[in-house]
Amino acid sequence: MSLPSYYITTPIYYVNDVPHIGHAYTTLACDVMARFKRLDGYNVLFLTGTDEHGQKVEIAAGKHGLEPQLFTDQVSQNFRDLLPALDISNDDFIRTTEQRHKVAAQVIWQKLFDNGHIYRDKYSGWYSVRDEAYFTESELIDGKAPTGAPVSWVEEESYFFNLSNWQDTLLEF
């Protein structure tokens, strides 16, 4: 009897800068788990990759005088090159700009939307691009995020995941 499949993934890393020790650490931790599970007979799928969207990426590309896609192509390759340098045993490397990712994301999004798990609403608040986080007025220090990053007031419509639909399931977990 074969053991069940085991799926493990690193975060998909933002390509706004070169890889650093934190990227190496999380990738190595996933690699250790993937290797252990393989030795234990599991059918492992170990995924890593890069997230090539967002304000941080757009800003970083602009600072380098490059179009975002060219910039992400270059930086994503740095992340890909890290894997053999660390002898990482990943099975796949995904880029959010790849067609296969776009199609899968759209299918999942549509299923969630059709089942009432995603809804559209408005939000506003003090946002830090660097921290990728919102802060309340009381959290700001001299008009900046607690990390010292600049913030700007943002008001926009967005989609939200209806987490309350999953409350009972999560509490039982």
Language-model features, listed with the residues they occupy:
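N-terminal, positively charged nucleic-acid-binding surface of large information/translation enzymes
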Residues: M1-F173
